[in-house]
Amino acid sequence: MALVFSALLLLGLCGKISSEGQPAFHNTPGAMNYELPTTKYETQDTFNAGIVGPLYKMVHIFLSVVQPNDFPLDLIKKLIQNKKFDISVDSKEPEIIVLALKIALYEIGVLICAILGLLFIILMPLVGCFFCMCRCCNKCGGEMHQRQKQNAPCRRKCLGLSLLVICLLMSLGIIYGFVANQQTRTRIKGTQKLAKSNFRDFQTLLTETPKQIDYVVEQYTNTKNKAFSDLDGIGSVLGGRIKDQLKPKVTPVLEEIKAMATAIKQTKDALQNMSSSLKSLQDAATQLNTNLSSVRNSIENSLSSSDCTSDPASKICDSIRPSLSSLGSSLNSSQLPSVDRELNTVTEVDKTDLESLVKRGYTTIDEIPNTIQNQTVDVIKDVKNTLDSISSNIKDMSQSIPIEDMLLQVSHYLNNSNRYLNQELPKLEEYDSYWWLGGLIVCFLLTLIVTFFFLGLLCGVFGYDKHATPTRRGCVSNTGGIFLMAGVGFGFLFCWILMILVVLTFVVGANVEKLLCEPYENKKLLQVLDTPYLLKEQWQFYLSGMLFNNPDINMTFEQVYRDCKRGRGIYAAFQLENVVNVSDHFNIDQISENINTELENLNVNIDSIELLDNTGRKSLEDFAHSGIDTIDYSTYLKETEKSPTEVNLLTFASTLEAKANQLPEGKPKQAFLLDVQNIRAIHQHLLPPVQQSLNTLRQSVWTLQQTSNKLPEKVKKILASLDSVQHFLTNNVSLIVIGETKKFGKTILGYFEHYLHWVFYAITEKMTSCKPMATAMDSAVNGILCGYVADPLNLFWFGIGKATVLLLPAVIIAIKLAKYYRRMDSEDVYDDVETVPMKNLEIGSNGYHKDHLYGVHNPVMTSPSRY
């Protein structure tokens, strides 16, 4: 019923959504990742036996030894094909005989064990009966007489130890029986819980299916919102992509032009500084020369006075006179050429404001997103309307699926099934209580027998007195012997009944394990069901014939089980495409075409981009031909490297002052000292402006020298790069816009194709997972049949059978051991006085004193009481 529901559900869904061909599920850049909500089921996939698991494995190993043959796949097929064993004239009797022989050969291990069990069942009562009659005739150990032998203590100990070991092994088997019996009761009680768990899983499946449909519908809304987000931001998305393609080409040349604009400003500033420095230098040099000439003339006048011609001043004055020629300026700034022409040219170039033209080029590129955003307003609106209409269709489709009616029908079926199980499972528990009670009785019977043996050993061992003769044994020892014989009696009385139970449960349990549980675990049982023409002669594939009335569809139980176990959807697992092919109705291409038609109207027109106009180009060319590259900068640098004066004025002043101080007081001395002050004043006030002008001139020359280095070649290269980029923009920008527009359209379309492919995948592979079906099947076979019934049953017969089989040696040993513990009516005595302290008895024919043979009472040979 669940399968029918799922098929109807998918029919309703597939009738509204469409595509062609098997979906090529792929990832789209920027697309959303979809995943159906995970459904958590309650029932476990595997069944853990718990602490009794090793015991079950031990039984499985035993069964593998008894029945080592592989699952008889071919034999089972033959049996099913010959299910009508019509023993008639026309029947193929030899084939049936061969088949029976194959069955017997396969079951040889089980048959041997069963035959041995039957022999045990038949012989043990007979042996017990004959043994009882034999004992009643004072035979078979029934005579209360014991012949003492020298190895009697050793035999007693060996027999006692052997019986103890056997009883311990029997106890172990009885414990297995108790455990298995209790496991059966516990597991059967858990059957109802397991069944309810599976029903809850089916209810979860029914509950989650509408949620999965709602989730699929909601994901279209999320996909649409994602597309709307890209459409609303088409300027930044599409425009950004176009801009990103243009920037690597445009940015380098604009940066070069921008750097050249900066160089123009720097050149203009350097020329201005150079021009002003030249003027300042000429003025300062002229003033310096004038002042130095005045001081030189003053010194010459002092040297020409009469005071300097007479001794002793004449020698000093003569030493001053040669140095006067160096008191002057070394600069020749008036001969440095002017740079006013170059300055005027560069000033005119700078008026063009090349930097603003570069910014305009950048702005043209940066405005592309806004341009695209403004041009696509109407087209974006139409695309949104188309996507909204598809959204409305999907919502109408989801509302038109008769999901509620289907869920009600399936839920009603599940409720009826659950109600039926709730009514029948208590009966199963009632029957199980009978089995449990019977199992307890069996286990307690064996426990009683083993208890008698243990009590016999306990009383016999601890009550035995090695100094007491057989007729004088104590009460405790005698009681031990009686317990042993009681165990023997109960053993003969019940062992055959126990063996009947063991044989029946062994045959059933072993075959269930080997023919159902193991082949189900390795899926060979499903291979039997998948055999063509086996379950129905006219059908090649039984499952597809049963579900679709089309036995030619290659659908097998094993494949369906494997797919359901993996959590695959019902549509794919049961190949419902043979009922309704989603590909015939799920027309992804049609939906994609509708969206693509609207996206094709997305035309973007970007006017020709001009990075730099003719004015800017002319400015670059004028700058290249401004003449700054023809200036003889070495002349200026050579001039700036000169010292403003031919001699160091401070040194000259100090020398003059020292010589003046050597002169006697008079006018020359006073005049020289005044000249020293004037020289120092010239050095302090007139020399710094000259030096500053020289430094400024030097810095400006250096700047211009660097800027003008290969200036025409640089400008030519920039213009060539500009022409190349401009040519690229003129010829390729439209192609870039068209290409990126198509990519944008494909991205938007890809969102929906990705969504539609996912919907197809979700419907066919994930939606309405049939995992609960495989879990329910595992629960029925692995869980209930094998785990709850077969394994405890096998452990039960294994334990009880082990204890029952060990009864045989236990009975034999107990019979022999009882003679050593029970009090005898008579005994044999050795002639050796050291062995028995009674010698004055008649000698019998066998060498022993047997007083009772002659009717003479002998207190040593007889016991005062008899048990």
UniProtKB/Swiss-Prot annotation:
Q: Which residues are glycosylated?
A: 273, 291, 332, 374, 415, 554, 581, 732
Membrane-side (Cytoplasmic) residue stretches: 129-158, 456-487, 816-867
**So where does this one cross the membrane?**
108-128, 159-179, 435-455, 488-508, 795-815
Could you state one GO cellular component term attached to this entry? cell surface
> Which residue stretches are annotated as topological domain Extracellular?
20-107, 180-434, 509-794
- Signal peptide boundaries: 1-19
Q: Which residues carry this modification: N6-acetyllysine?
A: 226, 258, 265
Q: What happens when the gene is disrupted?
A: Progressive degeneration and functional deterioration of both cone and rod photoreceptors associated with impaired morphogenesis of the disks and OS.
- Gene Ontology terms: biological process: camera-type eye photoreceptor cell differentiation; retina layer formation
**Tissue expression as described in the entry:** In the submandibular gland, expressed on the apical side of epithelial cells. In the parotid gland, expressed in the intercalated ducts. In the sublingual gland, expressed in intercalated ducts. In the extraorbital lacrimal gland, expressed in the intercalated tubules and larger intralobular ducts. Expressed in the retina. Present in urine within small membrane particles (at protein level). In the embryo, expressed on the apical side of neuroepithelial cells and of other epithelia such as lung buds, gut and ureter buds.
Q: Where in the cell is it found?
A: Apical cell membrane; Cell projection, Microvillus membrane; Cell projection, Cilium, Photoreceptor outer segment; Endoplasmic reticulum
* Assembly and interaction partners: Interacts with CDHR1 and with actin filaments. Interacts with NAT8 and NAT8B.
What the record says about family reads: Belongs to the prominin family.
| Role, per record | May play a role in cell differentiation, proliferation and apoptosis. Binds cholesterol in cholesterol-containing plasma membrane microdomains and may play a role in the organization of the apical plasma membrane in epithelial cells. During early retinal development acts as a key regulator of disk morphogenesis. Involved in regulation of MAPK and Akt signaling pathways. In neuroblastoma cells suppresses cell differentiation such as neurite outgrowth in a RET-dependent manner.
Query: What name does UniProt use for this protein?
Result: Prominin-1
What species was this sequence derived from?
A: Mus musculus (Mouse)
From which lineage does this chain's organism come?
Eukaryota, Metazoa, Chordata, Craniata, Vertebrata
